Amino acid sequence: DDLKELIAFPSVSTTSNREISDWVAERLEALGFQVEQTRYSDHRTVEKVNVVGRRDPVTAAKDGPPGFAYFAHTDVVPADEWTGPGGDPFAPVVSEGRLYGRGSCDMKGSLATMLSSAEQLSAVGQRGPLWIVCTADEEVGFVGAKHMVKHSAAYRDLVAAQPICVIGEPTELKVVHAHKGIVGMRITSHGR
């Protein structure tokens, strides 16, 4: 089960996400995706990895859709005071029909769903390209996304294609067209 395997990676933002990113890349390649990984070191010199996977349809529809892109992140917040079932937040536990573990909601559950969807939809059935994008350091300032924008050729290709995008962040099971985020600005005011 993909979700159980994803939860088992202790990919806390303060540590490297290399192992989970390599696992995602291998899983995408097994599903027929071409994969690009971009690596960087964070401010503590910890290795971080972003993943962009793209699978083209076997037969592209003429004037077909621009494609579909799923976005996820591989890091989770620390689990210092784990109150879920079991004693280890990175050992998935099923209790009363629910799966518990660090990241099961934000956002390893969404990533597992994305991988399952890609597996269910064969490249033969696709009408446009399919992307799955995973960034590092979303929980600590979106550093992975910023790095990907500057250094990923595969991401630039995705942007140029203007696909329909879904970001799998938790929204209490409601479909939303916008979500909380962050904006940085520099404002200069000249007074008298």
Model-derived regions, located:
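Acidic/His- and Gly-rich active-site-bordering loop/insert found
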Residues: 1-102, 123-127
